[in-house]
Amino acid sequence: MKIIGIDPGTAIVGVGVLEKKNGKLIVKNFQAITTPPIAKEKRLKIIFQKLNEILIQEKPEIVVVEELFFSKNVKTAISVGEARGVVLLASALNDIPVLELKPVEVKTIVTGYGHAPKSQVEYMIAKLLGLKTPPKPDDVADALAIAYAGFLKMGGLL
């Protein structure tokens, strides 16, 4: 089973690909989709095109993305929501189901504490996946954490 975790944003989208083979969880790929500081609709187009390429290449059984966390910064929440829409559209156009997880669920699964700081999530995901150091930027570590949490949520590692 192959799963892609996505941490959406308009400047950086973290992508993490995990695959279960012979009872082992393997990190297949991780990367950041970055966009230059241009008009938002052009950024979203770049995100869509690059994500669509990744979905076609990797052929995951499922995409996992965090539900929108509404913070005090409404502008940021709206931008993340727009990027999430691109993720959902790319997944739908490729007939890939989407699992949405709450940020607190991801943190609880990865660290054991739903309000863990970002640094703890990065540290734990590196340890859990056998990486020497946490992937950078942190959006990529978050994407791997989202994919890992998706596996556990679906019973993929049991």
Swiss-Prot record:
GO molecular function: crossover junction DNA endonuclease activity; DNA binding; magnesium ion binding
Matching InterPro entries: RNaseH-like_sf, RNaseH_sf, X-over_junc_endoDNase_Mg_BS, X-over_junc_endoDNase_RuvC
Location of this chain's protein in the cell: Cytoplasm
Binding-site list for Mg(2+) 2: 66
Cystine residue pairs: none
A single GO BP: DNA recombination
Cofactor: Mg(2+)
Cited Pfam families: RuvC
Entry keyword set: Cytoplasm, DNA damage, DNA recombination, DNA repair, DNA-binding, Endonuclease, Hydrolase, Magnesium, Metal-binding, Nuclease
Cofactor note text: Binds 2 Mg(2+) ion per subunit.
Classification via CDD domains: RuvC
Top-level taxon of origin: Bacteria
Gene3D superfamilies the record matches: Ribonuclease H-like superfamily/Ribonuclease H (3.30.420.10)
EC number assigned by the record: 3.1.21.10
Gene Ontology annotations for the cellular component aspect, listed alphabetically: cytoplasm; Holliday junction resolvase complex
Tagged with keyword Transit peptide: no
Active-site annotation: 7, 66, 139
Family membership: Belongs to the RuvC family.
Protein name: Crossover junction endodeoxyribonuclease RuvC
Organism for this UniProt entry: Carboxydothermus hydrogenoformans (strain ATCC BAA-161 / DSM 6008 / Z-2901)
